[in-house]
Amino acid sequence: MDINLILAQKYGYGLTFINMGVMGFVSIGFVTITGQAFNGPVLAALLTVVGFSANGKTVFNTLPILIGVLLASLGSKGNIFTLAVSGLFGTALAPISGVFGPIAGIIAGWLHLAVVQNVGLVHGGLNLYNNGFSAGIVAGFLLPIFNMITDNNNQRKMNIQRKHMNFLKTVQANIKKRIKKNEDEEKK
C-alpha cells in the first residue's frame, strides 16, 4: 500500500512520521496551554493537524499561527473551547507563515481568531465550517497584501543591485581607462 505523502516523497517516511508526532505534541501542548479539556471536536482538530503534517505543516510554520491566536485571545471575550479549536484549525494558514515568515503567521493567526468569533452566524455557528470559512477569508485578505509587500521588497532589492552593478561597471571602465592611459604614457 503506497501512501502518497508530500513530505514522505521528499524526506522519506521516517521523518514524515516524526514530524507528525512532533506536531501532535505541539497540538496537545497548545490545548493544554489553553486549558481546554480533550473532547471530540478538540481531538478531531488535533488529528487534522497531525494528518496534514504529512503535507507540509511543521513546527516552524504552525507555531506563529498558534502564537497569533493566543495573542488575539488576550483581548477577546471568546470561550476556551473556541480558542482551542480555532488555534488548531487555524493552522490551515500555515502556508502563509511558511512563505512570508513568522510575523505574517502571527498576523494571520490573530485575524483568524477575530474572524472566527465574528462570522459564526453565517452558517449557524458550526465550528468546523466556521474555521475553514474564516481561514479562507483571512488567506484571501492577507495574500494580496503580503504579495504586494514581497514584490515591493524584491523590486527595491533589484534596484539596489542594478545601481550597484552600474557603479561597478563605471569603476571597471575607469580602471581600464587608467590602465590604457598608463600604457600609452609608457610607450611615449
Q: Predicted segment positions?
A:
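Pore-lining transmembrane helices
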Residues: M1-N154, K188
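Short, highly charged, low-complexity non-transmembrane loops/tails of multi-pass membrane proteins
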Residues: N152-R178
